[in-house]
């Protein structure tokens, strides 16, 4: 037995003819073939090796012998079946249209016709039935004519107003036109009242509120008791006011003759009055019975401290040097001389300032002032001086 590997285009009929064997024998040996008529390349076919006689077909052109029976071809049953093309009987699916929802009926709202005048109120529903009123007979006036028809004959109808446009009106005289002034628009012209001088208004007088100025804190080693400064006479003329403020006017009859000097703790805007006398009030007299103090603060004679300034118009003069014993020697005031500002000459500063205006009650010649405390004794305590 031989094994034949199927090549492309081979069949069992060709393989049996090649090896000279019967086809039926080849089919019997190859029982693994489910369809002997269909073999694929690469398959192994078993072929018998024993010689099997092969029947030869008669040659064409020679007539068969008489009485010979025509035998059927042994491979007639093994002829390949004709391939029949089978059409697909499955019906084709029709293309379905997309689902479109039905459109609603866009008809206008149809309202039933009803009689508008045929309506009933709630009051009419509950009213009792009443019979209809009988119709009154109409009165006919045969001989009476309306007097208004006769009035039309007395007043004839007026003419139509259509021809009033063509009526002749009296001609108006031509008035001269006012000359135009260039550069001025009437809309932008503002009528203003000219500035008229206002009458003078009397100043408002108010009673001044006094307060005691406190001294600048100093070292306890320095002389002085640290008490508040006593009152002093008011200025003959007002001090220089601060910018943006008006001086306070005080009535002369209510002014006690004292006012408070500006110092670093002061925040009041009070200034001196006009014509205040330069004398001490009995209620605010000097605590030591001396002359009232001048319009300046005396500062302790310490190196680096502010130097006191004399009254405006008087220069201090001493006939002898100070011995330092705190005596009652008082300086003499010389003839009036215009002195400048103090060491720190600002009228609004509490220390080292001078009275910018001379005392109206002082004499023009130099005169001694008795019982006037010295600069160093102005703020001392009496009990310390007696010791």
Swiss-Prot record:
Residues 368-377 have a biased composition (Polar residues). Signal peptide: none annotated. Induction: Transcribed by SigE at time T2 of sporulation. Several coat proteins are extracted in reduced amounts from SafA mutant spores, one of which is CotG. SafA mutant spores have abnormal coat layers and have lost their resistance to lysozyme. Their response to L-alanine suggest that they have a defect at a late stage of spore germination. Their response to AGFK also suggests that they have an additional defect at a early stage of spore germination. The mutation of SafA has no effect on vegetative growth and spore resistance to heat and chloroform. It comes from Bacillus subtilis (strain 168). It holds the Pfam family LysM. Residues 2-47 form the LysM domain. This is SpoIVD-associated factor A. Keywords: Sporulation. The lineage of its organism: Bacteria, Bacillati, Bacillota, Bacilli, Bacillales. GO terms for molecular function: ATPase binding; lytic endotransglycosylase activity. GO terms for cellular component: endospore cortex. It is found in: Spore cortex. Probably involved in the assembly of some coat protein components implicated in both lysozyme resistance and germination. Could be required for the assembly of CotG. Associates with SpoIVD during the early stage of coat assembly.
């Amino acid at each position: 037995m031989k094994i034949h590997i199927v090549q492309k285009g081979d069949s069992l009929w060709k393989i049996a003819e090649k090896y000279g064997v019967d086809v039926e024998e080849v089919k019997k040996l190859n029982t693994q073939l489910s369809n002997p008529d269909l073999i694929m390349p690469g398959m192994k076919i078993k072929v018998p090796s024993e010689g099997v006689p092969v029947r030869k077909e008669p040659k064409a052109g020679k007539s068969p012998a008489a009485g010979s029976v025509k035998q059927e071809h042994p491979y007639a049953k093994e002829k390949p079946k004709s391939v029949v093309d089978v059409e697909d009987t499955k019906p084709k699916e029709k293309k379905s249209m997309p689902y479109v929802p039905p459109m609603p009926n866009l008809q206008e709202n149809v309202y039933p016709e009803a009689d508008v005048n045929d309506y009933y109120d709630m009051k009419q529903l509950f009213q009792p039935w009443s019979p209809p009123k009988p119709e009154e007979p109409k009165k006919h006036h045969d001989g009476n004519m309306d007097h208004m028809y006769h009035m039309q004959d007395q007043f004839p109808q007026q003419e139509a107003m259509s021809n009033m446009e063509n009526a002749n009106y009296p001609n108006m005289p031509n008035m001269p036109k006012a000359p135009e002034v260039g550069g001025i628009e009437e809309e932008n012209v503002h009528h203003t009242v000219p500035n008229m001088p206002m009458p003078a208004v009397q100043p408002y007088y108010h009673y001044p509120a006094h307060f005691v100025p406190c001294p600048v804190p100093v070292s306890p080693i320095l002389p002085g008791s640290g008490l508040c400064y006593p009152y002093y006479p008011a200025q003959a003329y007002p001090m220089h006011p601060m910018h943006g403020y008006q001086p306070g006017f005080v009535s002369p009859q209510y002014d006690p003759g004292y006012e408070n000097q500006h110092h670093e703790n002061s925040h009041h805007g009070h200034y001196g009055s006009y014509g205040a006398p330069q004398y001490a009030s009995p209620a605010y007299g000097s605590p030591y019975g001396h002359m009232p103090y001048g319009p300046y603060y005396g500062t302790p004679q310490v190196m680096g401290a502010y130097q006191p300034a004399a009254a405006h118009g008087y220069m201090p003069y001493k006939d002898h040097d100070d011995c330092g014993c705190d005596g009652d020697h008082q300086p003499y005031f010389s003839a009036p001389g215009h002195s400048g500002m103090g060491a720190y000459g600002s009228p609004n500063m509490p220390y080292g300032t001078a009275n910018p205006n001379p005392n109206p009650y002082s004499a023009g010649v130099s005169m001694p002032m008795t019982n006037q405390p010295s600069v160093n004794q102005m703020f001392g305590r009496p009990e310390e001086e007696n010791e």
